[in-house]
Amino acid sequence: MACNPDFVQFIIDQCSGAGEIAVKKMMGDWCAYCDGVLFGLICDNNFYIKVTEPGRVLLKEVILRPPYDGAKDYFNIRDVDDREYLSSLIKATLPALPKAKVKKNPMK
């Protein structure tokens, strides 16, 4: 089941207190980025955040499940109505995630 575009926009708006939120569509679902760092997924009208210890400490309810078949477990975030909670959770999660590697242009 694909995500409802209104739900995707709602998640973007709810997370905006954490930084610059962007999403990219990938195979019917959405990857969520904050300040250029991939931190979560929006799949089947569910919001998932990558598993980190700083994030676990702030979770109101720890629900681990894969967002799609064959994926690693993510935190399944049920309370998406609390904007401050989501922003705090993302801000705590980001420093524990690897930064994107800068791609170098190969010399020809």
Residue locations for each model-derived region?
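Charge-dense, helix-prone N-terminal extensions
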Residues: M1-K108
